[in-house]
Amino acid sequence: MDLSILIPTYNNINYLKLLCKSLKENSNFQHQLIFHINDGSDGSLEFIKNENYLYTHSKDNIGLCSSIKEASKLIKNDYVLYTHDDMYFCKDWDIFLKNEINKIQNKYFYLSGASVSYKDSYIHYDCGKSYENFNIKKFNDFCLVDNSPDYKASHYAPHVVHKDLWNKVDGFSLDFDPGDGSDPDFCMKLWLENVRIFKCISKFKVYHFGSVTTRKKNIKLNKGTKKFLLKYGFNPKFFRKYYLKSDGVLKYAGPVTEPIFSFTFLIDIIINKLKYYYFKIT
C-alpha cells in the first residue's frame, strides 16, 4: 500500500531532516513524498533537491492550505496522508495503517496517527523537546510496549483519506490560509460527504515537537475559529464535541452518529448562534 504523503515546510530544516529520516527508515512501502517548500533559504530547498524528492516551491510563505494545494497536484497514489514537518514516524507505522484500511473495505474514512509529545497530545511521554535532544531509542522502545487503545479521532495530523475523497472535498480550503482552522474544516467537509469513521490508530505513532512553524515570531495566524463559525454556524469545539464525539482523549467506540439533542447541546448551539450573529454584524 503506497501513499502520497503531503509535507508543507517553512524553514525547519533540522526537523525536516528528522522527519525524512523516520519515513526512510521506518516505512515498509515505497511512498510518494511530496513537499512544498516555503522560502527554503535555510537549506531545506537544497536538501530536498539533493535527496531527489518531489516538491513544489514558493519564494515566500504562502500558507499551509495553499502549500498543500500546490503539493497535491503531484498526487499519484490512492491514499493521501498529510503530516507536519516536525513529526517523527514510528517503526512499521504504514503496516499498522494498512491493516486498519483493509478492515474498513470502503473509501469513507478518516484515519489519524496517535501523537506522542512532551506536552498536550493523545499520549503524554517526554522523548525530547526539540530535534537537539530527541531520544529516538526512548521513543522506539515506548512504541514497542505501549498498549494504549485506539482513540476517537479529532482533526489532528497525521491523517489519511482516500484520494477520491480528497479530490471530492478539494483538500484543504484556501480561505483558511495561513492555516488555523483548516483541519476541522477538512473534517467537516468529510462529514458532509457522509464520512463517519474518524479513528485514531494507537499503534501508528508519531512524535510531535509541537507545531514548530506556528510558534515562529513572524507567523501571523488567521482567525480560524471565527472563520469556521461563520462558515458552519458553530465553532470547532462544538464540532469536536457533538459531531466527532472527541472532545478530549476518548477510546474509539465505532463510527460516529448524528449529533444527539440534549439540554447541553441546546445551550451550546444557542451560544454559538449568538456568536455567529455577533460576528456577522461586527
Ranges and model annotations:
Residues 2-4, 32, 185:
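Cell-envelope/extracellular polymer assembly enzymes that use nucleotide-activated donors
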Residues 21-30:
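Short, acidic, metal-binding catalytic loop of nucleotide-sugar glycosyltransferases
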Residues 29, 37-46:
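A conserved acidic beta->alpha catalytic loop
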Residues 58-75:
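Glycine-rich, basic loop-to-helix element that forms the pyrophosphate-binding segment
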Residues 80:
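Short aromatic/hydrophobic "clamp" motif used to bind/position activated sugar donors
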Residues 91-130:
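Conserved donor NDP-sugar-binding/catalytic core segment of glycosyltransferases
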Residues 110, 120-123, 128-151, 155-160, ...:
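C-terminal, non-catalytic tails of nucleotide-sugar-dependent glycosyltransferases
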Residues 152-170, 176-204:
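A short, conserved alpha-helix in the catalytic core of glycosyltransferases
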